[in-house]
């Protein structure tokens, strides 16, 4: 149980692929102009990570070490092609918005990295959980960045959600403030870099605060009864 918890915590926070490892920055910065696009690519990446980790882990005993990387890439490419066709069939608007970044999941360092570092060494169930956790960690980072850029740039949230979730999702669109002209800095790549930098700084501050609290808690437990630690 502790191993399962550790895999989840590592994927979502401690070893977050976007905010700690800084992998997959090309799609992270290019696609996150809206919350819908960010969520769509994030979920697609999560599905690919889960399925590829599961497949590679299942076949790990029959995969020759000398040619394992080409085999991993072939498996990843097959899964990405299937996911791309699913998005094309059931969410064509999102497919058009994401464009080339769906097939580029094949070359995403996150996917290949987890296949080599985790799935090739662990069992199928734990590998699938690792892929899901890493994918959801990246999805959360994409969604937060996409939401911030959309709100600051257009004053809306979930604009175009129907492209991802269907026509019923039009009701999810929220107009936070009205603007006649979008704030282009937030919508263009410089805004993505600035937003990512702020998110990295925020995560660092949260980690430092949590570390300080843990240190104080350990120090309090180490003191004899009745002492407060004050000089």
From Swiss-Prot:
GO terms for biological process: electron transport chain. Its EC number is 7.-.-.-. Pfam families: Rnf-Nqr. The chain crosses the membrane at residues 18-38, 39-59, 63-83, 86-106, 125-145, 182-202. It is an enzyme of class 7 (translocase). One of its GO terms (cellular component) is plasma membrane. Keywords: Cell inner membrane, Cell membrane, Electron transport, Membrane, Translocase, Transmembrane, Transmembrane helix, Transport. It is found in: Cell inner membrane. InterPro entries: NqrDE/RnfAE, RnfE. Its main location: membrane. It is a multi-pass membrane protein. The complex is composed of six subunits: RsxA, RsxB, RsxC, RsxD, RsxE and RsxG. PANTHER family: ELECTRON TRANSPORT COMPLEX PROTEIN RNFE (PTHR30586), ION-TRANSLOCATING OXIDOREDUCTASE COMPLEX SUBUNIT E (PTHR30586:SF0). Part of a membrane-bound complex that couples electron transfer with translocation of ions across the membrane. Required to maintain the reduced state of SoxR. Belongs to the NqrDE/RnfAE family. This is Ion-translocating oxidoreductase complex subunit E.
